């Protein structure tokens, strides 16, 4: 417990919360060759490796993910949502924050329907999350 005189000398510091997507919180100045702190909702990146991994204990599947080098130079592991994808090495993708609960170390999602990541085909519901266009009506 702090005394009154200790608190007068130095007040209590408020807790600062850490960001859940640290790679989106800075950019890279190419001319000065140093990082600059500013947050972005998404960042562009290039796929280095596209592969699968198995989830944590009670679940069983082959989840698709990509290792992505972002425009600020950092490398992140990003999940590819939806059924089927056309991503391969050197594909340019848009990466947003958001972790995958049963994949350890995956803190980012690839945005479907942006850049080289095509939208999910034959999707009727929840289309905006998977970059699908409105299907044409048959007469």
Swiss-Prot record:
This is Small ribosomal subunit protein uS12. Residues 8-18 have a biased composition (Basic residues). Residues 1-21 are annotated as: Disordered. Pfam families: Ribosom_S12_S23. One of its GO terms (cellular component) is small ribosomal subunit. The keyword rRNA-binding applies. GO terms for molecular function: rRNA binding; structural constituent of ribosome; tRNA binding. Keywords: Ribonucleoprotein, Ribosomal protein, RNA-binding, rRNA-binding, tRNA-binding. GO terms for biological process: translation. The gene is rpsL. InterPro entries: NA-bd_OB-fold (IPR012340), Ribosomal_uS12 (IPR006032), Ribosomal_uS12_bac (IPR005679). Belongs to the universal ribosomal protein uS12 family. Part of the 30S ribosomal subunit. Contacts proteins S8 and S17. May interact with IF1 in the 30S initiation complex. With S4 and S5 plays an important role in translational accuracy. It comes from Onion yellows phytoplasma (strain OY-M). The lineage of its organism: Bacteria, Bacillati, Mycoplasmatota, Mollicutes, Acholeplasmatales.
